[in-house]
Structure formats: structure tokens, C-alpha cells
From Swiss-Prot:
Keyword Lyase: yes
Matches recorded under Gene3D superfamilies: 2-C-methyl-D-erythritol 2,4-cyclodiphosphate synthase (3.30.1330.50)
InterPro entries referenced in this protein's UniProt entry, alphabetically: MECDP_synthase, MECDP_synthase_CS, MECDP_synthase_sf
Signal peptide residues on this chain, from the entry's feature table: none
Family that this chain belongs to: Belongs to the IspF family.
Residues that coordinate or bind a divalent metal cation: D10, H12, H44
This protein's name: 2-C-methyl-D-erythritol 2,4-cyclodiphosphate synthase
E.C. designation(s): 4.6.1.12
Length: 162
């Protein structure tokens, strides 16, 4: 077995609500996400990166938005489930790097809590989890404050068991 790299991307538009779930953290905001689950773009991007690194498809295959069982699902539960699939495939997360792209709300004060949630769910030290945020300089849908996007890259290492 060799090292594996995975990349994930997710986006959700804003809709009715009073908070956003990002990185497992509840962030007060004037809107919520339009989504089948809790809409956590960051955790969804991480799930896709993990699944991609193991050639296990994508989040839509494992948690389809046509399945009522996942309606309103806590994305931390999804991430923990994906982590079990990664481990069953004989891999462990070496590290991950993720970016949240949003004009608003500001993410900086929430990043330490996001890192802690992700590290806990993936059984990692927080030093192996990096989360950063950027704007799109008022360009595109994120710049117009119509939604938020996130990207994630993960490095997996073999555990020696399959």
C-alpha cells in the first residue's frame, strides 16, 4: 500500500435560518444553508477528500439527498462514518488542509473550534488539521454572499492492516 491523496469540494447556498454549521461549529448568522443535511460545507469537503483518496466514490453516493434517513443529519456523524470506511480500507489520516471560501460571516474566531471538532472526529492531534478561511474578493456567488464553498486535501497513510 502507498500514500494516498484526496481532494474534496462542497458548496451550499444561503437560505432561511439563523446559523451555519461549519467544521462542526454552530456559527450565528442572518441566514442558514439550503441543504438536505445540516449543510456543513467544510465537513462535506473533508468527507469527499477522504472518500476520494480511498477510491470510494463521493459523499452523494454514501449519503444521498434522496434518502430521508439523512435529512437534517449532523455532518459530524457523516465524517465519523467516512472515517470508519477509511480505516476499514487500511488507511489512517496523516494530515488534512482545508479552506473555507466565504465573504461572510468571518471565520477566524471559529477556526480553533473547527480544528478541534475535526481532530476529534478523525482521532487526530490538532497539529494534523489545518483550517483556513479566505474571501473571493467579492467575486462570484461567495463574493455576493449567496453561499459558502470549501475545499479540503487529505493525505492518507497505510495502517499495515486491511
Amino acid at each position: 500500500m502507498t500514500l494516498r491523496i484526496g481532494h474534496g469540494f462542497d458548496v451550499h447556498r444561503f437560505g432561511d435560518g439563523d446559523h451555519l454549521m461549519i467544521g462542526g461549529v454552530r456559527i450565528p448568522y442572518v441566514q442558514g444553508f439550503v441543504a438536505h443535511s445540516d449543510g456543513d460545507v467544510l465537513l462535506h469537503a473533508i468527507c469527499d477528500a477522504l472518500l476520494g483518496a480511498c477510491a470510494l466514490g463521493d459523499i452523494g453516493r454514501h449519503f444521498p439527498d434522496t434518502d430521508a434517513a439523512w435529512a437534517g443529519a449532523d455532518s459530524r456523524d457523516l465524517l465519523r462514518h467516512v472515517h470508519t470506511l477509511v480505516m476499514a480500507a487500511g488507511y489512517a489520516v496523516a494530515n488534512l488542509d482545508a479552506t473555507v471560501i466565504a465573504q461572510a460571516p468571518r471565520m477566524a474566531e471559529h477556526i480553533p473550534a473547527m480544528r478541534a471538532c475535526i481532530a476529534e472526529d478523525l482521532d487526530l492531534d490538532t497539529t494534523a488539521v489545518n483550517v483556513k478561511a479566505t474571501t473571493s474578493e467579492r467575486l462570484g456567488f461567495t463574493g455576493r454572499k449567496e453561499g459558502i464553498a470549501a475545499e479540503a486535501v487529505v493525505l492518507l497513510m497505510p495502517t499495515g492492516t486491511t
